Amino acid sequence: MIQVLLVTICLAVFPYQVSSKTLKSGSVNEYEVVNPGTVTGLPKGAVKQPEKKHEPMKGNTLQKLPLCTTGPCCRQCKLKPAGTTCWRTSVSSHYCTGRSCECPSYPGNG
């Protein structure tokens, strides 16, 4: 009963499995799936690279994301330059690294 249930689940989840074709070399790892159900053998040791079908990018389609949103080393969604004072005590000062919105050793960092 359990085996029937497992087979049914497998068939429901993986309905379009393609069986591999064993080549003359005896290796099942040397095959190329052209489309489901069709397997084309490659020469021993050959690797076929997939075709690249990329269209050239037209204009700047990427949106700039904010580098930071809050923190003592963040101003208007941009990181403050390295060396900018982010926290000062009577004994010492702490400076932004230019790579993080958090101040090193800032008490609000936890």
Swiss-Prot record:
Keywords: Cell adhesion impairing toxin, Disulfide bond, Secreted, Signal, Toxin. A motif (Cell attachment site) lies at residues 88-90. Expressed by the venom gland. It comes from the Eukaryota. The keyword Signal applies. Residues 1-20 form the signal peptide. Residues 27-110 form the Disintegrin domain. GO terms for cellular component: extracellular region. Belongs to the disintegrin family. Short disintegrin subfamily. This is Disintegrin jerdostatin. It comes from Protobothrops jerdonii (Jerdon's pitviper).
